[in-house]
């Protein structure tokens, strides 16, 4: 079988104007970005406001493994198959970050014959939204440091006289706004800036990956341009010497930041290998951010299609939990069905049983022990009141016997049902049975509910997430987190939802604990306010908001030939 990029390159794309026309978009609602991409105007949702929303399907998975479970493959394959079955479907996915593209994970266009094309355009730059987020974010960092420099240089009174601005009295030890870059760069996690006589007071800072920027979350959670502007204004960049928040609005930089991101608020339309529509918009990671594509993309797709298929990052304890308790809480657009993706490899890897045997070979013991992880995720999604369909993503090495055992085992769970998907190797034709089952699930009663109410305390929300969301017995807070919790309560941020940043490789905080961890304490090391996005991030265990490159990163395989064709992109 050809590589993903070879399959993408061998395919002749339809004009993106044809994709838009088939979806029901008007010519003046498109801003073309070459032949294969178009920005979509937010006016679409207004034009079709009276139209009933499509059924929403959310794709999640079991606890991730290094082998990959195939959420995006399933999301795209399901969309392709629904359209083949005569159901008008549209996919909504996140924009890939170049950090993972050149790191270990690779791109995020799907794979095989279930991918968004051209995959190299999707995985590299797309329409520049991530760059806009980076630029707007780093403008705020430059602005707060410049203000600190001038106020320190002149003193508060002289600064006000010379500038006509009120001194903010920034506490250099409490500048909360870090910088971002769209690459994995561990050496920038903790830095000091301001060295040199004319470069401002020295203070600690650091870089996060752009996908972890609060601006990326704001882009994903905003309803329109006005909402984007208001949210950016609420960003808390630093504290003053009295411990009070200094916002982007107070600093006077919110308007300029919004201008940089004005085009980024429009979703990008591309197509699958079958010529089906796919919106790509926003790219927050699910382990260190809220892990879902934008509300705006969903809102537009909901007025154009009969079914919208979107995905949440990593396992259901990560992206799906945040989809439910953060994204749906904001949008009010609840799912009618969910899909939990699983592979035989994932179950064996999640068994926690050490074995020298090739994981591609039959192994009944590991499969049966690892099944508990799948059942946990089925139960986890079910508690939100959404029908669960299990998509068994088939690999060529899978045996019929193990697949049949798995299907029978799933029949004894709370799942609506299960189907084997071969979308990777067969495209739409490989997922028609799955598409039929998922569509039937969307037609059954769904009683979606949130895990906690907004009016409960942050401490109560943390306990609920720990105990009900992860199976922990208790929560422990570091001294730093306790102090931050008190500050948040004092400044009336207690009703915000929680975004837990933790390892995705275990339901717990420890990536080495497989299966279904129980009886553990969830250690909260830090609480970060995201006043603009509208949530509080709780950092758990040893999680990092800036990844690092591995010993053999993906960029080693990437090059360009004499004809200008990219090679080695995964």
From Swiss-Prot:
Pfam families: FTHFS (PF01268). Keywords: ATP-binding, Ligase, Nucleotide-binding, One-carbon metabolism. InterPro entries: Formate_THF_ligase (IPR000559), P-loop_NTPase (IPR027417). The lineage of its organism: Bacteria, Pseudomonadati, Pseudomonadota, Gammaproteobacteria, Alteromonadales. It catalyses: (6S)-5,6,7,8-tetrahydrofolate + formate + ATP = (6R)-10-formyltetrahydrofolate + ADP + phosphate. Pathway: One-carbon metabolism; tetrahydrofolate interconversion. GO terms for molecular function: ATP binding; formate-tetrahydrofolate ligase activity. Disulfide bonds: none annotated. Belongs to the formate--tetrahydrofolate ligase family. ATP binds at residues 65-72. Coiled coil: none annotated. One of its GO terms (biological process) is tetrahydrofolate interconversion. Its EC number is 6.3.4.3. It comes from the Bacteria. This is Formate--tetrahydrofolate ligase.
């Amino acid at each position: 079988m050809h590589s993903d990029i070879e399959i993408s390159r061998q395919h002749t794309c339809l004009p993106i104007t044809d994709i838009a026309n088939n979806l029901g978009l008007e010519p003046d609602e498109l801003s073309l970005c070459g032949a294969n991409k178009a920005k979509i105007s937010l006016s679409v949702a207004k034009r079709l406001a009276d139209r009933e929303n499509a059924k929403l399907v959310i794709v999640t998975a079991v606890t991730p493994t290094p082998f990959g479970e195939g959420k995006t493959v399933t999301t795209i394959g399901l969309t392709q198959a629904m359209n083949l079955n005569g159901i008008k479907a549209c996919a909504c996915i996140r924009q890939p970050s170049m950090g993972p593209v050149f790191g270990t994970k690779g791109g995020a266009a799907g794979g095989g014959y279930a991918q968004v094309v051209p995959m190299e355009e999707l995985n590299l730059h797309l329409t520049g939204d991530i760059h806009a987020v980076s630029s707007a974010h780093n403008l705020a960092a430059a602005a707060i440091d410049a203000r600190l420099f001038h106020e320190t240089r002149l003193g508060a009174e002289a600064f006000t006289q010379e500038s006509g601005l009120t001194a903010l009295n920034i506490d250099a030890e409490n500048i909360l706004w870090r910088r971002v870059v769209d690459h994995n760069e561990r050496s920038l996690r903790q830095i000091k800036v301001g060295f040199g006589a004319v470069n401002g007071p020295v203070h600690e800072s650091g870089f996060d990956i752009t996908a972890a920027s609060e601006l990326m979350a704001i882009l994903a959670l905003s309803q329109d341009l006005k909402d984007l502007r208001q949210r950016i204004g609420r960003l808390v960049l630093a504290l003053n010497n009295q411990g009070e928040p200094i916002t982007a609005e107070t600093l006077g930089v919110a308007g300029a930041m919004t201008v940089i991101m004005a085009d980024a608020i429009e979703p990008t339309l591309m197509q699958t290998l079958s010529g089906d529509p796919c919106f790509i918009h926003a790219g927050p990671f699910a382990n260190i951010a809220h892990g879902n594509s934008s509300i705006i993309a969903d809102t537009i797709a909901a007025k154009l299609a009969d079914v919208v298929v979107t995905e949440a990052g990593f396992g259901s304890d990560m992206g799906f939990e945040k989809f439910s308790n953060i994204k749906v809480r904001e949008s009010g657009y609840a799912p009618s069905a969910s899909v939990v993706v699983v592979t035989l490899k994932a179950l064996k890897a999640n068994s926690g049983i050490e074995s020298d045997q090739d994981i591609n070979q039959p192994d009944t013991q590991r499969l049966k022990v690892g099944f508990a992880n799948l059942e946990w995720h089925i139960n986890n999604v079910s508690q939100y009141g959404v029908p669960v369909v299990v998509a068994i993503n088939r690999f060529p090495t899978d045996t019929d016997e193990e697949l049949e055992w798995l299907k029978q085992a799933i029949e004894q769970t709370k799942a609506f049902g299960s189907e084997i998907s071969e979308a990777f190797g067969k495209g739409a034709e490989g997922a028609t049975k799955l598409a039929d089952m998922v569509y039937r699930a969307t037609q059954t009663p769904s009683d979606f509910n949130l895990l906690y109410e907004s009016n409960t305390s942050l401490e109560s929300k943390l306990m609920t997430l720990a105990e009900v969301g992860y199976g922990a017995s208790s929560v422990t807070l570091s001294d730093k987190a306790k102090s931050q919790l008190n500050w948040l309560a004092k400044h009336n941020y207690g009703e915000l939802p929680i975004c837990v940043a933790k390892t995705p490789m275990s339901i717990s905080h420890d990536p080495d604990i497989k299966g279904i961890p129980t009886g553990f304490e969830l250690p909260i090391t830090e609480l970060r306010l995201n006043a603009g996005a509208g949530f509080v991030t709780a950092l758990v265990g040893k999680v990092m908001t800036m990844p690092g490159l591995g010993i053999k990163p993906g960029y080693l395989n990437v090059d360009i030939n004499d004809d200008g064709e990219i090679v080695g992109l995964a």
